[in-house]
Amino acid sequence: MDFLNMSYQLIVAYLIQLGIYIGALAVIFFNNIVYAAISLALVLSLIALLYLFFDADFLAVTQILIYVGAINVLILFAIMLISLPKSSTFIFYFTKKSQISAFACISLFVLLVKIILQTPWSTQSSYILLNENNKLDQIGIYLLSNFLLPFELISLLLLIALIGAVSIARYQNTEETE
């Protein structure tokens, strides 16, 4: 009976992953950028569902609040702030710059995979995984003590990106009106 229950769970996990893959491909291949952003929201929501499936409630709620609720809304806001041409066709020309960019991206991906495979992952925070009662408490303590500086630097980087996007959009709008 447990085997049957486990096989249902495995099927559900594979279906969620399939939905993530299909949604990610939709983000890439949609011609309309608003549809791509909505597809991204679907992918991020399915990732949160996968977190729930693996009993990571805090990560699932954080995924929904931060990525689906804030980042995706920010992306949609930026899309609507910057007036794009109403072109429905997308033509990709494979130029020398795109070849260099593709080579750099593939090289970076291979390097990251190599680093990930060679890294000896420590079990320093196994206490968080073993102690079910204080999971959120321990994450909060680590976030506000050991990882406070990276957390604040990421929030500062997001603020700078938002200010830069708004200033670029305003600069382009003032050029169009003149």
Swiss-Prot record:
NDH shuttles electrons from NAD(P)H:plastoquinone, via FMN and iron-sulfur (Fe-S) centers, to quinones in the photosynthetic chain and possibly in a chloroplast respiratory chain. The immediate electron acceptor for the enzyme in this species is believed to be plastoquinone. Couples the redox reaction to proton translocation, and thus conserves the redox energy in a proton gradient. NDH is composed of at least 16 different subunits, 5 of which are encoded in the nucleus. It catalyses: a plastoquinone + NADH + (n+1) H(+)(in) = a plastoquinol + NAD(+) + n H(+)(out); a plastoquinone + NADPH + (n+1) H(+)(in) = a plastoquinol + NADP(+) + n H(+)(out). This is NAD(P)H-quinone oxidoreductase subunit 6, chloroplastic. GO terms for molecular function: NADH dehydrogenase (ubiquinone) activity; quinone binding. InterPro entries: NADH_UbQ/plastoQ_OxRdtase_su6, Nuo/plastoQ_OxRdtase_6_NuoJ. Belongs to the complex I subunit 6 family. It is found in: Plastid, Chloroplast thylakoid membrane. Gene3D superfamilies: NADH-ubiquinone/plastoquinone oxidoreductase chain 6, subunit NuoJ.
